[in-house]
Structure formats: structure tokens, C-alpha cells
Amino acid sequence: MSKKLTFQEIILTLQQYWNDQGCMLMQAYDNEKGAGTMSPYTFLRAIGPEPWNAAYVEPSRRPADGRYGENPNRLYQHHQFQVVMKPSPSNIQELYLASLEKLGINPLEHDIRFVEDNWENPSTGSAGLGWEVWLDGMEITQFTYFQQVGGLATSPVTAEVTYGLERLASYIQEVDSVYDIEWAPGVKYGEIFLQPEYEHSKYSFEMSDQDMLLENFEKFEKEASRALEEGLVHPAYDYVLKCSHTFNLLDARGAVSVTERAGYIARIRNLARVVAKTFVAERKKLGFPLLDEATRAILLAEDDE
């Protein structure tokens, strides 16, 4: 690697590359979430028969992973670059390796391994066959072929590629701490994110109001159900995301027991499943508008029989 790309140049390079592969460039979704997979641009679009190719950066919050800015690679909030392609291209791994070349990483000169790591997200009823991608001993990407999302079997199968941008940038720039990553020329990652990292860690572990969070969870759950009763999928899913983040804050605070934890996850999962079913029904009612005419006619005719 000759030129060391800045963090924002890595993002721009990946955006241009996946745009060239036919992906729409979406923007980060404006609700807290623990992973790019939970964005409606993945969770909702991975289900149902319609094609979907998208790429986007997703800031991902994991309160329990906060370390007050003292750990060089463990963060309350990190950034993922998410690629979802449905149906999955047969050459998705080759496309991924070519993306690394665009970043200046020649696969022939590095030890790149696909290590089996099947994926599951219990809180959304989602699972798939997966691999971690290791670059010279460091995990930089998660590869997943979704088999189930929101409790529904996926058909066609969606391929998801999730780059860990901080890890990738640390490798490309040869720095040991994420806070030393150059975000833009002359501006370090730590100059932007170190103080927020400390403050969010302090809040998550020491300051959050447990009673308020417990009350909020109940309210968000009820509001999601109320929206679903009216067939309002997207507002309902927003409240599912709020439930998830509220639970993560409670979990980080140590406010839920092991038994209660399983119960909260089940409650979020039940909502996510209803959202998924309602979304597919909504798309069907619209006539699956992203399908080509021939496939749409066949599917709708089958359902009418």
C-alpha cells in the first residue's frame, strides 16, 4: 500500500466502488442501532421477493462496549460500511476482494481468510450462514448470507458485507489505536470522537436513569404495537429500534438479570417479527413495485390461486 487513505477517503472509495457494482448509496438511518443490519435498509429490504442493492455507512452504538476512550479498539460507537445485495451475486466474494484492491490491499500479497462464523441476532429473529474475514490476523469484515430475517425465511437470499471501518482504517494507516486514525488531512479520529466516547461511557455505566429507561421501554413497546395495529410498519420499526437501544442501555447499566434479559429480547423479537410480516404484506398490496413485470405477474398469480 503506497498512499495511506484517510478514514473519509476509505468511505468515499467504498461508496464509489459499490455504486459501480449497482448499489444505491443510502444514508445512515436516524435512529440508534447496534449494527448496520438493523437499519430498515437491510432488515426490511432483506425480506420479500423484491431485489435490493444498497450500500451505506452506519454509526453503530453498543453501550456495553464503551471503555471511556481508554481502550484502543473497543468503542461505544463505531462505524460500519454496509453492503446488501439481493439476490446475492454468485461472485460476491470476488467483488469483495476487488473492493480491498481499490483500498490498496492486494489479496495476493496478504493473508486473507474467510473464517466460518454463522450469524444470529436473537432480538430480531434473524440468522444466516456467515464468515469473518481476517486480514493478516485482524478481523475486518463480516460476510453473511441471510437465511431468516424477522422470523421469515429469505427468498431470494440476501448477501450482506459489513466492513468494520475503524479496524480497516487502523490496518491501512498502520496505527495501534483508533484515536490515532487520520479522519481527514490533519484531523485525528480522537479529536472528533474521544470526548463523546468518554461521555457516553460515563452515561451508560454510571449516570443513566434506570427507572426512566424501564418506563421508556414499556412506552416504546406499546407504541410499536399501536402503530402495527394501524398497519404503520415504518413508525412501528422505529419504536422497535428504540426498544432495542433502551434495552442495550439497561443491559450496560446492569439493570436486568439474566432471566429478565431473555424476556426483554423475546419482547423485541416478537415485535420485529410482526413488523417483518406486515412489511411483506404491505409490499404485496403495492404489487411488489421493485420486481420486473414478468416475475411480479407470476408471484401475484400464485398468491391468488
UniProtKB/Swiss-Prot annotation:
Its EC number is 6.1.1.14. It catalyses: tRNA(Gly) + glycine + ATP = glycyl-tRNA(Gly) + AMP + diphosphate. The keyword Ligase applies. One of its GO terms (cellular component) is cytosol. It is found in: Cytoplasm. InterPro entries: aa-tRNA-synth_II/BPL/LPL, Gly-tRNA-synth_heterodimer, Gly-tRNA_ligase_asu. Keywords: Aminoacyl-tRNA synthetase, ATP-binding, Cytoplasm, Ligase, Nucleotide-binding, Protein biosynthesis. GO terms for molecular function: ATP binding; catalytic activity, acting on a protein; glycine-tRNA ligase activity; transferase activity. One of its GO terms (biological process) is glycyl-tRNA aminoacylation. The keyword Cytoplasm applies. PANTHER family: GLYCINE--TRNA LIGASE, CHLOROPLASTIC_MITOCHONDRIAL 2, GLYCYL-TRNA SYNTHETASE. Tetramer of two alpha and two beta subunits. Belongs to the class-II aminoacyl-tRNA synthetase family. This is Glycine--tRNA ligase alpha subunit. It comes from Streptococcus pyogenes serotype M4 (strain MGAS10750). The lineage of its organism: Bacteria, Bacillati, Bacillota, Bacilli, Lactobacillales.
